[in-house]
């Protein structure tokens, strides 16, 4: 059987009531299920379930983007221009770029994780302006963490694991509001990292 490099999209399921779209992909090496929730304008929370060696996203999303990835199971590898990083269970990365990464690699052919993509040209400038004691500005958080580079990785930490563990088990009935709170919590925690 000939190996097809790119996963072929075999189905798209939109659940308007839940506010998400699920994309199903497959090739002779495996499959992937990607569920995208739009949380705020310009902010997506994405559940990734991948069982193949590589995944070409094929996204045309451009702008000033911040990508946050959390690895729950397996391993994900990504190249950002001249930088290369990988995440194992519990690890988190923050990266800045002008367009979505097109290819992710999965050497174990097994990956479950959550991604948060923030397009700062479309998202609110301040996520927490209605809370007087909380100042969360995603672009400033990413610039401080990434410094002069394009990415920042945190190896497995309990406080990061706690935030994401709740995202994997949230009941459907209040997912949308809960996603907003958890993204705000994550950005607040990241803003406190020195």
What is the role of each PLM region?
Residues 1-62:
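N-terminal low-complexity or simple alpha-helical regulatory segments
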Residues 79, 86-194:
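Alpha-helical bundle regulatory/interaction domains
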Residues 46, 66-68, 114:
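Hydrophobic residues positioned within well-ordered beta-strands of beta-sheet architectures
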Residues 13-19, 34-41, 80-88, 133-135, ...:
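A generic short-segment signal for beta-strand/edge and adjacent turn/coil regions
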Residues 49-51, 69-71, 117:
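Residue-level recognition of well-ordered beta-strand positions that form the cores
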Residues 62-82, 92, 120:
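Glycine- and acidic-residue-biased ligand/ion/polar-headgroup-sensing regions
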